[in-house]
Amino acid sequence: MHPQKNAPQIDAMFLYKHRKNVHKKDATTNQISFDFNNWYTHALAQSPTFTQTMQLTGEQMAILQSQGNIKINAVAGSGKTTTLIEYARSRPPSARILYLAFNKVVKQEAAKKFAQHGLHNVQVETAHSLAFKHVVPGRGYKISPHGYKTNEIADILQLSSGGEKHAEFILASHINKFVSLFCNSTAQKVQTLDYLSTIADSKAKSFVQKHHEQLLYYTRLFLSRMDKAEIDIVHDFYLKKFQLSAPVLPYDYILFDEGQDASPAMLEVFLKQHACKVIVGDTHQQIYGWRHAVNSLEQVDFKSYLLSSSFRFGPDIARLACEVLDLKSHYATHTKVLIEGKGTSEKLQTKAVLARTNLGLLLKAIEYVTESKKIKHIYFEGNINSYTYADDGASLYDVLHLHQGRKLQIRDKLIKGMKDMKELEDYISKTEDMQLGMMVEIVKEYGGRIPHILKSIKDKHVGDEERDKAQMIFTTVHRCKGMEYDAIQLANDFISQEKLEKLNDPKNRNKPHPGKLNEEINLLYVAVTRAKKSIHLPEEFLPEGFPDSPHIHVMRNAIAEKDATDASRNHQQSHEKEKAYDVEQVRSKHSDAYKPWTPELDDELTVLYCEGVHVKDLMKHFGRTRGGILARIKKLELPELYD
């Protein structure tokens, strides 16, 4: 549990004063170890209220008492940062401690927290910031901050098509991925890696087999040119250089956070150090396998500890999270996870829509900006432009111009080289470029309405400094990892039990790898565990037989992914009102259209309205017309009371 704000600080000075009692020196090894029991006894003597105000759980206490290398499997919201702070504070005050954070944002937050607790002996880094300091200065390297576009690699390496349509761009795309695979691996040489095994699509696999020698040659050439500083280096390149240099780091303790998504290259550096090692993470939050990350918690034989209580959410959301993970039993042996939900939050300030993909998120954002007049300010986690641009640099507008035959207006060289959408889709299948694939789907869905829709989204979007003004936050699961919101809504692009059963059907010849299914379920688990107070989710994501809960709102009759697309194509004007001249026709479409509103239904409508649920979803949920929903909202004076 998190310490209370007024908790007494058992700081480095206190430990120094009592060093004879709390630290032991081994006469044989000369190593200093920490005696938790003596520290705790002296802390209690120093402050009689220590045990009451610190409120550490038994699991946290066990971690503080530990000696040697350990790994901590910590469920979502279990106070792992608090635990690591207390762990660091309980070590010798002269100990040199390195905390490895997952990304820059987490690094900045962690640095503040350690400093606030007087732990100035803790250095906070990310894997990349640490590697940068050891590799880049003084070597003449320049960084390519956003990596390389496919057409840039084709130009740098002077690739040719060889008579095969767009082969130079397809090859460049695979070179980019091969470089990423090598830089994140522990391999000493590129040629020892099996790149082909990472490819799933049959067309892409066929291309790689046919051009394997070229792919290997040009990948090595591209890496060599970066190494010689002939071209700018990518971030993963200096991480790889760091690993290959076999560094010896000057720390007594190294704390490795988010260990379930570790770069193999950085993990090797970590494991080779002589320091006392701590890995913390959540096995079921592994969602970066596509970026070659591995679950280090499963790769080391350190003594294992648990943090199984979540202080973010209560028992109902905890149960839902556990039952989501039970989906893994459909394709593998699964040990049931138990999470104790101890959260008691009743606030309703931050509301967020979470999706698995950029496409799913944009579709929900489009619904909000075109249908909901009350939404004035929205916020996208991360740069809003990143949702309309592929990593390669191609924009949604480029794909739209290709779709409309306006090639002169296309800026991206790769898209400009495509004859038509069919050629682009063929390229996508040979490269497994999922982001471009999503853009194609959006363009097919909304066509010429896209410029107006994107303008509406950007007009309502607030910057980072005004994030608190946002009435709704939009984010993918990957972008909100480590974050939390009072109320969340899930888009319908996650995996469901029904989808899982179809994919895992013995008759399915293209059954996905269990590791990919694992990450799909993990994505749903991570999404569910971002909520502090309440969740709104399509009914297909609710486990069968799950009990009613005031914190879990099921959006009945939610449209499935394909149905949503079909419905949207038929829906020419987003503000078009339903023409319901025939009562029976309306009743057949909206089963409860003319049933009276009860106090219970009014209460439910009020809750859903306050938590930002979209009118379209309210229509499906209550089985009523748009006009019926809006009339009841007006009757209850909800805009006046809650907007």
Where are these regions (language model features)?
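C-terminal accessory regions
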Residues: 440, 444-475, 481-487, 492-569
